[in-house]
Amino acid sequence: MTEPKSYKDTVNLPQTDFSMRANAVQREPEIQQFWTENCIYEQLSQNNPEDLFILHDGPPYANGSLHMGHALNKTLKDIINKYKLLRGHKVRYVPGWDCHGLPIELKVLQSMKSEEREGLTPLKLRRKARDFALKTQQEQAEGFKRYGVWGDWENPYLTLTPEYEAAQIGVFGQMALKGYIYRGLKPVHWSPSSRTALAEAELEYPEGHTSQSIFAAFPIIKSSKDAQEILDPFLSNLGVAIWTTTPWTLPGNLAVALNPELTYAIVEQTSNLCNYQYIIVAADLVERLSATFSTELTVKATLPGQILEHTIYRHPLYDRESEIVIGGDYVTTESGTGLVHTAPGHGQEDYIVGQRYGLQVLSPVDDAGNFTEEAGQFSGLNVLKDANQAIINELKNKGSLLKEEPYLHKYPYDWRTKKPTIFRATEQWFASVEGFREAALEAIKSVNWIPPQGENRITPMVSDRSDWCISRQRSWGVPIPVFYNEETNEPLLTEETINHVQAIIAKQGSDAWWELSIEELLPEQYKKDAHKYRRGTDTMDVWFDSGSSWAAVAKQREELKYPVDIYLEGSDQHRGWFQSSLLTSVAVNGIAPYKTVLTHGFVLDEKGHKMSKSLGNIVDPLVIINGGKNQKQEPPYGADVLRLWVSSVDYSSDVPIGQTILKQLSDVYRKIRNTARFLLGNLHDFDPEKDTVSYDQLPELDQYMLHRITEVFTEVTDAFEKFQFFRFFQTVQNFCVVDLSNFYLDIAKDRLYISDTNSLRRRSCQTVLKVAVESLAKAIAPVLCHMAEDIWQFLPYKTPYQSVFASGWVEMQKQWERPELTASWGKLRQIRTEVNKVLEQARNEKAIGSSLDAKVLLYVSDQDFKKQLESFNPNDSLKGNQVDELRYLVLASQVELVDSLEAIKKADYQSESELVSVGVVKAEGQKCDRCWNYSTKVGEFSDDPTICERCNAALVGEF
């Protein structure tokens, strides 16, 4: 007896060197090396045919390691840039760094021994700060590159370079010459712990701050003319009640403000609450205050607020008299007494009211937060420590204290030192927003805000904001280029002085301000008077630094443009960089520096908690990429999985990350990779020039698949155009799993493996696989850039493009659009799903192993549908196009369309549904040794007695 033949060498199995495992830790850097060596980004950014596209980088702070917020932000930017490159745009991305300011100064000071700090000059400190910033910038740049981010890494922008600083001085100068810059004694957010003024964006409001709040009464000594008749009967024993959460500001009290629209009451208290039998409060609050003070308050008279204006009271702690004044709509009955203690040196609203009434700006507090001699008996006490209690005790002694109680509220802290700030009037430099507020609000309307609520956030911020305090009392920053007359203290700030300093800084950097003599810093016409001047020691707010980047980078670099296409940062930047950039750009040029602003949320842990060292829930992007110390618990996922996470989340709100999420994403990544590997493996012998099958010759299944490809990649394109990357993620994942792996490729194996190499049946399928693999590589390239390039480099045929990024975006042909196929193939896919359920039932009960062991019976009641199915079920496997057949659709050896439900009911395994009823029985005939299908023809071919008619034909090139 002869040995049965082996047919394994006659089957076309997949062949590819594209690895099933990504091995990202090793492979991704190799791909990045390929991009660098071949200047892929540089070539495309210069040679692409379409318009220039500029996403302008908001500079991260050159301070510390990269965190998940950086990873989210930089990856979002890179996804957009890579998509625009694939669409043929010239994309120039210049990464930037914010290098000045207090946080860096603090890091440097913390690293120094106390004796080192003793002899520290501004220049020594600046050099150390510069070294620290540059070292951090280099480390961060390496991290960003490892994420796969493309950009002009050799030529980033740093806010500490001479050309940047000079452009910033230019912005300041233009604003000064337009009258928008002024010096004033005004209350600003002051950080005693940092000893400098702070901008709104440098504050944070932690939960759980408790202040000691007080109610106090000030003695009324003289009535206003209009209120005389009502007040005089009570005047000998009358107080006006105020409430404050900052008792330390009482030494600065110069007025009490009321709301002219409110009605006020004179109430009597008889329980020795304070020294005054009668007190004035808002009429609406009498009941609430009775409860607060735990004493009966009896209304003796009421009067409109307006007539109390100019009533005079005496300060309970000092020998000075002040007036009751009309405040703004901030005086309400929501809390307090309806009358507001007003200290123009300690509050923005107080200051505005004080200006209206010509009040002094009194702020008896020094840089460290200690009372000065102006505060009298409290001199030397610290306002955030012992001053509050001392003042409360003194009010008690004077019989003015009505009540003290702890008050939990939001209070501004210094974002770096994490310590409370105060409002304190100091001589500062301001940008007067009033001068260009309307223009800024108009500019906001011209911008495309994504998501749209971004506009609703920034509009009230700009419309309500006070003037911008731009001076800082620190050394590490760009100097405010002003000189002061030694005798009069008057500032010298002219076009000539600004231009001269700007030219010096452009050559020598801002150290020159500290290095050169006054004579050298002054222009020619002022040199002879140099001895009369001293240089200013203030530096500019870092938000003015980064807020000038449109001028120092976008406008100044030839390869860029202004306004730019897009700014993209976290939602906290509505009060930070988006706003400072808008204000400077509008002040100087009357336009917004950006056309679109896109914002993202913050990164939280898997439980939705903020990440913090104390909670131990910090996720480190480099650990995601390279793995942690324990690689079982923290495996190395590579940059692409991190990037896939970025594309999977709805970044418009806060986004979670953690090991469970990463594991799920890693599974999705692997599915996409395995799909690509199958496609590549089955194209190993395909030469597109010779083997492509024309569209009209393709079986209907393939035409349907090209239609699906059109639908899928139209959706993906729309997702990228609208920056909705989570739609890309869902669509591509679904396409790879549902359309390809579970459907088309599952059916395709029979065509690809057992047909003759050159058969139409096989080449038509490969024609679709080529479209699928190239479309997939291009579409995932903005996100999974390393995998996309890897796929492209393993294409088994020649292409004219060195890199996937040079190949352009997904191309779809008009003729592939066949919506009518969606309906008919939708039904066929439904039949496949129903059949699979019954096959699974038979498999579970061990009636069959593979689905090829089965014959499937189908019954449909709809006659038209039955006709369609009959055309998909020829009697002879070698007739028709050998693809559009029910047996291949359901992967069974035979399919029979039966005329009645009875036949189905006789089957061993069955199911009924509205569309189709399914029965499964054992397949007829014998199993073919080559394709494992059952056939009644096995044994009919004397040379090959163990194979079926299809395989017999395939071996001679006819199937």
Swiss-Prot record:
<protein>
    <recommendedName>
        <fullName>Isoleucine--tRNA ligase</fullName>
        <ecNumber>6.1.1.5</ecNumber>
    </recommendedName>
</protein>
<feature type="binding site">
    <location>
        <position position="931"/>
    </location>
    <ligand>
        <name>Zn(2+)</name>
    </ligand>
</feature>
<keyword id="KW-0648">Protein biosynthesis</keyword>
<feature type="short sequence motif" description="'KMSKS' region">
    <location>
        <begin position="610"/>
        <end position="614"/>
    </location>
</feature>
<comment type="function">
    <text>Catalyzes the attachment of isoleucine to tRNA(Ile). As IleRS can inadvertently accommodate and process structurally similar amino acids such as valine, to avoid such errors it has two additional distinct tRNA(Ile)-dependent editing activities. One activity is designated as 'pretransfer' editing and involves the hydrolysis of activated Val-AMP. The other activity is designated 'posttransfer' editing and involves deacylation of mischarged Val-tRNA(Ile).</text>
</comment>
<dbReference type="InterPro" id="IPR002301">
    <property type="entry name" value="Ile-tRNA-ligase"/>
</dbReference>
<keyword id="KW-0030">Aminoacyl-tRNA synthetase</keyword>
<keyword id="KW-0436">Ligase</keyword>
<dbReference type="GO" id="GO:0002161">
    <property type="term" value="F:aminoacyl-tRNA deacylase activity"/>
</dbReference>
<dbReference type="InterPro" id="IPR014729">
    <property type="entry name" value="Rossmann-like_a/b/a_fold"/>
</dbReference>
<dbReference type="GO" id="GO:0005737">
    <property type="term" value="C:cytoplasm"/>
</dbReference>
<dbReference type="InterPro" id="IPR033708">
    <property type="entry name" value="Anticodon_Ile_BEm"/>
</dbReference>
<dbReference type="GO" id="GO:0000049">
    <property type="term" value="F:tRNA binding"/>
</dbReference>
<dbReference type="GO" id="GO:0006428">
    <property type="term" value="P:isoleucyl-tRNA aminoacylation"/>
</dbReference>
<dbReference type="GO" id="GO:0005524">
    <property type="term" value="F:ATP binding"/>
</dbReference>
<feature type="binding site">
    <location>
        <position position="928"/>
    </location>
    <ligand>
        <name>Zn(2+)</name>
    </ligand>
</feature>
<dbReference type="InterPro" id="IPR023585">
    <property type="entry name" value="Ile-tRNA-ligase_type1"/>
</dbReference>
<dbReference type="Pfam" id="PF00133">
    <property type="entry name" value="tRNA-synt_1"/>
</dbReference>
<dbReference type="Pfam" id="PF06827">
    <property type="entry name" value="zf-FPG_IleRS"/>
</dbReference>
<keyword id="KW-0963">Cytoplasm</keyword>
<keyword id="KW-0547">Nucleotide-binding</keyword>
<keyword id="KW-0067">ATP-binding</keyword>
<dbReference type="InterPro" id="IPR002300">
    <property type="entry name" value="aa-tRNA-synth_Ia"/>
</dbReference>
<keyword id="KW-0479">Metal-binding</keyword>
<feature type="short sequence motif" description="'HIGH' region">
    <location>
        <begin position="60"/>
        <end position="70"/>
    </location>
</feature>
<dbReference type="InterPro" id="IPR009008">
    <property type="entry name" value="Val/Leu/Ile-tRNA-synth_edit"/>
</dbReference>
<dbReference type="InterPro" id="IPR001412">
    <property type="entry name" value="aa-tRNA-synth_I_CS"/>
</dbReference>
<dbReference type="InterPro" id="IPR009080">
    <property type="entry name" value="tRNAsynth_Ia_anticodon-bd"/>
</dbReference>
<feature type="binding site">
    <location>
        <position position="569"/>
    </location>
    <ligand>
        <name>L-isoleucyl-5'-AMP</name>
    </ligand>
</feature>
<dbReference type="Pfam" id="PF08264">
    <property type="entry name" value="Anticodon_1"/>
</dbReference>
<feature type="binding site">
    <location>
        <position position="951"/>
    </location>
    <ligand>
        <name>Zn(2+)</name>
    </ligand>
</feature>
<dbReference type="InterPro" id="IPR013155">
    <property type="entry name" value="M/V/L/I-tRNA-synth_anticd-bd"/>
</dbReference>
<keyword id="KW-0862">Zinc</keyword>
<feature type="binding site">
    <location>
        <position position="948"/>
    </location>
    <ligand>
        <name>Zn(2+)</name>
    </ligand>
</feature>
<dbReference type="GO" id="GO:0004822">
    <property type="term" value="F:isoleucine-tRNA ligase activity"/>
</dbReference>
<feature type="binding site">
    <location>
        <position position="613"/>
    </location>
    <ligand>
        <name>ATP</name>
    </ligand>
</feature>
<comment type="subunit">
    <text>Monomer.</text>
</comment>
<comment type="similarity">
    <text>Belongs to the class-I aminoacyl-tRNA synthetase family. IleS type 1 subfamily.</text>
</comment>
<dbReference type="InterPro" id="IPR050081">
    <property type="entry name" value="Ile-tRNA_ligase"/>
</dbReference>
<dbReference type="InterPro" id="IPR010663">
    <property type="entry name" value="Znf_FPG/IleRS"/>
</dbReference>
<dbReference type="GO" id="GO:0008270">
    <property type="term" value="F:zinc ion binding"/>
</dbReference>
